[in-house]
Amino acid sequence: MAEPGFFNAMLIGALIFGYVLGSIPFGLILARLAGLGDVRAIGSGNIGATNVLRTGNKKLAAATLILDALKGTAAALIAAHFGQNAAIAAGFGAFIGHLFPVWIGFKGGKGVATYLGVLIGLAWAGALVFAAAWIVTALLTRYSSLSALVASLVVPIALYSRGNQALAALFAIMTVIVFIKHRANISRLLNGTESKIGAKG
């Protein structure tokens, strides 16, 4: 049996590994490589896929979405070789890294894509629940932000109902953070001024 000190060091190492991986600002990097400048200077100023889409480059936005998700998936799957606790630590680290990336002044995205990526890595069936909730909400309301909020809210409930308390607790914490990062969106939703899917600007 591993010593407690080694176990704790392993978890800290997994957390740091996940954070560094999650901190890679793919939206910013891809936009610059495509000659679109600093994505933080347009729209919401966010580095995520939704704001990259405001450049008008759908392929670039899709690439950003995929890469931001893969950060979470890769962190969780690689760390899983050292056990579920390490995978959870690395996944959470990747999520936090995306939100607060050290490379660009700790001002990152809102975490939805990386949330989904971590979910794929830790509980792929939960990712199907997320996708279903997102699609249904989007079809009914046309609000991307609301769809993400509803989907993230459903996930920990679904995980808990399946008896996976550890993952349910992790994603409950991540969901709270997602809601906090979407404060402005929630305010606009309540005021009826939130942009709908397909709207420009």
Curated annotation (Swiss-Prot):
Q: Does Transferase appear among the keywords? A: yes
Question: Which HAMAP family did the record assign?
Answer: PlsY
Pathway(s) of this molecule:
Lipid metabolism; phospholipid metabolism
Output this protein's name: Glycerol-3-phosphate acyltransferase
Q: Where in the cell is it found?
A: Cell inner membrane
Which gene does this sequence derive from? plsY
Substrates-to-products reaction catalysed: an acyl phosphate + sn-glycerol 3-phosphate = a 1-acyl-sn-glycero-3-phosphate + phosphate
- Pfam families given for it? G3P_acyltransf
Q: Which organism is it from?
A: Brucella suis (strain ATCC 23445 / NCTC 10510)
| Binding partners and assembly | Probably interacts with PlsX.
* Segments crossing the lipid bilayer: 10-30, 60-80, 86-106, 116-136, 139-159, 166-186
State the EC number(s): 2.3.1.275
Instruction: List UniProt keywords, sorted A-Z.
Output: Cell inner membrane, Cell membrane, Lipid biosynthesis, Lipid metabolism, Membrane, Phospholipid biosynthesis, Phospholipid metabolism, Transferase, Transmembrane, Transmembrane helix
Provide the GO MF annotations for this entry. acyl-phosphate glycerol-3-phosphate acyltransferase activity
Q: One GO CC annotation, please?
A: plasma membrane
GO-annotated biological processes: phospholipid biosynthetic process
Xref: InterPro entries: G3P_acylTferase_PlsY
Q: What does this protein do?
A: Catalyzes the transfer of an acyl group from acyl-phosphate (acyl-PO(4)) to glycerol-3-phosphate (G3P) to form lysophosphatidic acid (LPA). This enzyme utilizes acyl-phosphate as fatty acyl donor, but not acyl-CoA or acyl-ACP.
